[in-house]
Each structure stands twice: as C-alpha cells, then as structure tokens.
Amino acid sequence: DDNDFTNSWLQNRIQTKLYGKHRIKHELKLKGIADDMIDEHLDAHSSDDNEYARAFKLAQGKVGSFEGSDAQRSQRRLSQFLMRRGYSSAIAYRVCKDIFDES
C-alpha cells in the first residue's frame, strides 16, 4: 500500500542517496503519493538537525572536487549542488559557511 511504499522510499532516499526533503517530496509527488501522507512521513523521519547532518556529510564528500577554484565560486557551486539534491537554501548556506570556515 501507499503507506509502506512511502516509508521504504523515504528510508532509501534519506539513508543511501542523502537526499533532502524537497527532492524526496518532489519524487513522491511524481509517484502519485498524496501531499499529506508525504508530509506526515517526512516529519517522522527527518528533523532539521538530521537534514543539516546529511547535507554536511554530502558536502564533505563533494568539496574536494572544487579544489583549485576560488572560494566564492566553490561555495556557490557547492550550494547549488546541495539545493539540487533537495536541501533548502538556508541549510545549503549554513553547510557552505561551516565547510569553508573550517578551511
């Protein structure tokens, strides 16, 4: 049923793909899942802290590919990458700030 499918799809996208809420919600809508069911499952599986942690982990793996670029360009590219993966602009900005402040 839709409930089980939504749950397993969410688990897969969160744990293996490290997708953000926006991307997951979009994919589930394309599969024909109702908005209220999507929101219910997303709220149960993903908090803002978890979302930030996943985005940070994803960014750490990606940031090495930007070596040699100037910092501003690298930050912009990383931010755009995170937003394409479904993270909000606020989380993408926070992750980029934290990653590039570490350097």
Show the residue positions of the predicted features.
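An alpha-helical, amphipathic repeat domain used for nucleic-acid recognition
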Residues: 1-103
